[in-house]
Each structure stands twice: as structure tokens, then as C-alpha cells.
């Protein structure tokens, strides 16, 4: 009969400084299916090292080890993990159950890595626990179970994927005599069902219950009686689980990794919350700055637009402050008519102005009187709370009519409900009120100067007695480039005047400058917020590194029951991403609260959350989890299963 496990001249040595210490010295051993074998020896004899090699947790330095005819030395790490999943079941002295999982969930772990569907996995775990007398303890956590019950859960876990070979390391070492007898009885039952049972022990009473006792001393086998031939041993073995494959296996594996990651995080709620805190603050900072910064920018731009955007002002002279008399009369009414005929002009309004006294009954105030056309109010986006603007007949006839701003109305008519039709003195000229321009609220504050507007023909001919204009304001048609319009306007007037005796002021340039400035400031603040997010990410990495250290034994257990390095990497990476995503969701919630609070104190601001801001937050959370979770996850995946199992 061909042996199931075949070892030939197995040697295992470990470095000790500059030397190599040989722990196993030429072990040759055959073990057959259905055998119950005990490996005995004193501490340091090499029996645990031999068991690790038998269970494919460790590799021999030299020699040949075959499992069902397959040479283990030719297998890579993933193939060894598959071999452990499909052929071996481990029973440890200290049970090695995962404390944050129930008995049922602990039993399911090997099948999770085998890719068994959840429903089948659950039924299989319940069946095994029922067979071992734990049907009423399926939802109990390890801390709620006795030592004997924990060891039975460990046995059920070993059988989950079939457990053709049961490797029991001191299975009764931590149990009282009664519980120890129960465990040994179960191992005998497994032997009777066709399992190969290998017990590593130093207890002679336990070893005596095996059919074959192999003694190892100083790394060499000193006693190895012949095997007892078995008949029909395969007839009663456990069924090997049937797994899904392809895309379904990937989806199932990812879902299970997500579930296990959530359970691990839920087991340490306070630490998880503190880990999230940096991410919460970072995401809240990024989202709040993006959203509030955008609201502030829109508020500033709205105020600038209220002054008049897409407009070009033309003034006489070389620049602001130029009072050279030869330039004061540069702008004429003919210039206004020529400008209005240009195809890119939506409207053009002249302006002449002078500071005058306004009088009504016994009220006397100073104000700025401005001669404009009816288009002036459209150019500057102003609306009327009472009355209306000038019509063409009033402009042509130099009508004695006036439009007040809201501040002037309050000064002259504090108690009147309707002021249209009232007559006031503008300087020494009586003028009938035909409208009140609505005051525009601005974050820059309102002007303290009282202002009134008259037809420019009236202002020039009746009030000031001048034939030239102080300025012309041109509104450019939508869709036409403002800079190009400014160039054409300059070219037109220069040709008409024969020289450049004027200058222009383009509000669109101011708007673009403000947009650039606010964008730069917002970028700077966002970078500051991103720094806080990076600090939070470093916190996640630190905690995950600590978590890997604390959970080293758990990683060893998972590898022993069949987890591949990629499975471990995936789980810890998902944990890091999950922390960051939940932290990101809480950060977005916090930013909503911040925005809501700001909205209460700043009612004029329109604070809204764009899909872009939320997408940015989601991507930041995910990227932070992947970036700062990679190193801890990689460290976990690189752990040696033997070292991980023995580490405290």
C-alpha cells in the first residue's frame, strides 16, 4: 500500500549566528491513510518541527516530503496553502480559536478560504458542531466556552474541509482528565471514519492510545514500529467540500473578506473609532473647504457682477487721476452713437456727474447726481422697487425727471409710501421723481454716498452746461470675448480722435483676477486640509501596524487553515479601506453639519454639496485606505505561519 505521507532523509536547520543548528537529522518516515500515530519526545527533540513540516507549515532544508505522491518542495506558497486546505486539519494545544468569532464562525473559517458558498458552509459547520455535542453552543464566543468545548470547536474546524489528515499538537495538554478523555474518544472516532490522526505529545498515556508510537530524540527517530495495514479506510472519510470557481468565487471571497474585516474592527470599537478620528477630521476639512470655499467664491463673484460684469468703462485722459485739461473733453456724444452701432455692443450708456445738494421741504442733503441713459440700470443689473427708468422721449427732450437710490428715498421721504410723482430740487433745478432703484446687498458693504440719476441730456444741458461726457460704459454682448471687444473699442475711438486720449477699464479682467485669486486661495486651503488627511492616514497605518503585531497569532491560524498570502493581504487592506470609508462617511456628515451651521450665521451664502465634492471625498477615503493600509497588509501577508503561531 502506498503511504499517504512519505518522508525521506528530511533535514531542517536554522541559523544561529554564523552557524546552522540542525533540528531534524535525516528523518525517514511513512504514514498510511487511516493510521493513528503518536509522535513522542522530550522538549527540544524536534517533534514540533516535524509536525510543522508534515502540515506544510514549514519546509525541510533538504530531503523529500510527498503528500499523496506530490513532492511538497515543488509547490509555491499558494499551492501549499491549497494543500493545507484540502488535506490537513490542525488541532492545537491552546485551541487557537479567533476570539471575535462565534463557535460556528470559527468552524467556517477553513471553508471561507476554500471558496464554499455561505449557505453550504453554514450547514456544514452546524452539522459538525452537532456531531461533537455543541449544537447549543453555536453562537457562543470562545471566552464563553470551557476548555473541552473549545477543543471540540477546534476539531470541528479541522474537519470543515474534509480533514483527511488530522494533526493534533498536545490535544489534551490544556484540559482536565475528563475533557481529555472526551477529546481522545473523538480522535478515535475520526480514525474509525478513515482519517489519518497524528498526535504530537509527551504524555505516555495519550501516546499509548495510538496504534503506532514514533519516538524522536535529538532530531532523529529512535523508535518506529511498522504500520498496521488498514482495509477500506477510505469508505468513511469526511466529504471534501465542493467549492465555486471563477467570478463567483472572487465575489464570494471578497464579500467574506469584507465581513471578516468588519467583525475584526467591531471587536475593537474604541480603537477603531480613534483610528477613524484623523480620517473624519481630514475628510470633513477637505469637503468643507471645497464646499464653503466655492460658496464664498460665488458670493464674491455675485457681488462683482452686481457692480456690472462684461462691461468696459471708457474715461478721458491717460489713466486714473489724470486731470490734464486737454483730455477732459475727449469723449463726445458722437462717440456714444458710434459705439452703440458696433455689432458686439449690447448697450452703451454715457455718464456725466457732479456733486449737488438735494432738497425736499425742509430736508437738505448732499448727493452725487449722475447723468445717464435708460440703459444704465440694465448695464449694472439694477432693478426698481418703485417706478421705472427714463424713456427715449425724456432723453430727447431733456426732461426734468430723476431716479433716486433707496438711501436717498429714505432720507428725503422717510414716511411716504409712494414717492413717484414727488418733486425735489436737484441743485437749483426742480425734478419729478419717476423711480427708485433697489439697493443691492453686497458682502463688500453698501455705499454711504447718496446717488440720483437724471437723463444725461438733462444733466449736461440744464444742470452742468457741458457738451462732453465724463465716461461711457459699454456692455458687451453675451458670448463675445471681452478682451477682443476692448481692443476693437480702443481701435474705434483712436481712429475717431486721431490719437489715444482716453483709457479703458474692463470689469471682466477684474472678475477673472478675482476668480484666479479665490481659486488659488481655495487650493492653498485644500492643501492644508489634505495635510490633515495625510496625518489621519498615517494614524491608520500606525494602528494597522500595531494590529498586525497584536494579531500575529490570528494570521498564523488563518494560514494554518488554508489562507493564502493574498487572502491575508486582502483582509488587512480591506480593513484599512473600511476604516477610511466609514471615517469618510462620518467626515462628510460632519461637513454637512458645519455647512448647516454656517448657513444659519451667513444666510446670504448659498452652500450646497456638489456631486464632485462627495466623489472627491469618497476617492480620498479609498485612496487613503489603500495607500496607508498597503504596508501593514503586506507585512501581515509576509509572516511565516510557524513563527506567527508561536508568537505571543
Swiss-Prot record:
Source species, domain of life: Bacteria
Places the protein is found: Cell inner membrane
Binding-site positions, ATP: 41-48
Primary location: membrane
Gene Ontology BP, a term: response to antibiotic
Enzyme Commission identifier(s): 7.6.2.-
SMART domains: AAA
Membrane topology designation: Multi-pass membrane protein
Transmembrane portions of the chain: 273-293, 523-543, 576-596, 600-620
Pfam families: ABC_tran, FtsX, MacB_PCD
Stored CDD domains: ABC_MJ0796_LolCDE_FtsE (cd03255)
Alphabetical UniProt keywords: Antibiotic resistance, ATP-binding, Cell inner membrane, Cell membrane, Membrane, Nucleotide-binding, Translocase, Transmembrane, Transmembrane helix, Transport
Keyword Transferase: no
Residue ranges occupied by any ABC transporter domain in the UniProt entry: 5-243
CC terms in the record's Gene Ontology section: plasma membrane
GO molecular function annotations of the record: ATP binding; ATP hydrolysis activity; transmembrane transporter activity
Family listed: Belongs to the ABC transporter superfamily. Macrolide exporter (TC 3.A.1.122) family.
Oligomer status and interactors: Homodimer. Part of the tripartite efflux system MacAB-TolC, which is composed of an inner membrane transporter, MacB, a periplasmic membrane fusion protein, MacA, and an outer membrane component, TolC. The complex forms a large protein conduit and can translocate molecules across both the inner and outer membranes. Interacts with MacA.
Physiological role: Part of the tripartite efflux system MacAB-TolC. MacB is a non-canonical ABC transporter that contains transmembrane domains (TMD), which form a pore in the inner membrane, and an ATP-binding domain (NBD), which is responsible for energy generation. Confers resistance against macrolides.
NCBIfam families from the UniProt entry: PRK10535.1 (NF007826)
Name of the protein described by the UniProt record: Macrolide export ATP-binding/permease protein MacB
Gene: macB
